C-alpha cells in the first residue's frame, strides 16, 4: 500500500466555518475534488441548506465562498486500503493550527464524522462539533437526518 496525499484547503480569507473531513475518498482523489463520490451526501446536504445548486465544481466552490465555509481534511496523508475511514493508518495531519492562525475569522470547526473529530482531538486538542458522516456508509442516517443535523450547526 502506498501513502495517499490529500488536498489543499479551500479557504477564502473571510470564512467563519471550517468543515473538516478525514481523508478524500478514492473517487474524490480521482476527480480532484472534495466529496466527489456521488453517493456521498455532503454536496446535496449543503445545496439543500443554502438553497444553491451544486451540479458543477464551480457551483460547489461558489456555495462555499458565498457562505463563508472553508473545507479541509484532518489528514495530510495516510496509508489506507480501500476507502473506509476505519482503514486509515499512519496518519500525518494537516497543519490545522496554521490554517486557523492565518484565517482568524474562522469561529467554528465542524467535523464531518467521528474519525475527523477523533483525529482533531488527538493532534490538536481543539474544540470541534462532531456531526454525522455524510458518507453513504453511514446508512443509519438519511439525507434528511443529515440536513437537519448540519442545519442546526451551520445556520
Residue ranges, per PLM feature:
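A polyanion-binding, active-site-adjacent surface
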Residues: 1-108, 112-118, 123, 129-132, ...
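Post-His helix in hydrolase/transferase enzymes
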Residues: 140-147
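A polyampholytic, Gly/Pro-enriched intrinsically disordered region
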Residues: 147-155
Amino acid at each position: 500500500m502506498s501513502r495517499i496525499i490529500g488536498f489543499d484547503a479551500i479557504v477564502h480569507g473571510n470564512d467563519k466555518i471550517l468543515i473538516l473531513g478525514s481523508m478524500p475518498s478514492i473517487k474524490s482523489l480521482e476527480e480532484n475534488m472534495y466529496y466527489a463520490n456521488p453517493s456521498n451526501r455532503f454536496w446535496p446536504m449543503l445545496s439543500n441548506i443554502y438553497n444553491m445548486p451544486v451540479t458543477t465544481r464551480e457551483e460547489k466552490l461558489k456555495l462555499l465562498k458565498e457562505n463563508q465555509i472553508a473545507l479541509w481534511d484532518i489528514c495530510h496523508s495516510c496509508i489506507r486500503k480501500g476507502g473506509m475511514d476505519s482503514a486509515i493508518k499512519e496518519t500525518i495531519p494537516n497543519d490545522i493550527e496554521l490554517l486557523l492562525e492565518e484565517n482568524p475569522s474562522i469561529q467554528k470547526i465542524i467535523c464531518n464524522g467521528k474519525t475527523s473529530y477523533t483525529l482533531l482531538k488527538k493532534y490538536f486538542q481543539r474544540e470541534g462539533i462532531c456531526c454525522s458522516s455524510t458518507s453513504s456508509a453511514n446508512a443509519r442516517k438519511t439525507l434528511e437526518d443529515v440536513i437537519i443535523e448540519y442545519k442546526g450547526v451551520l445556520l
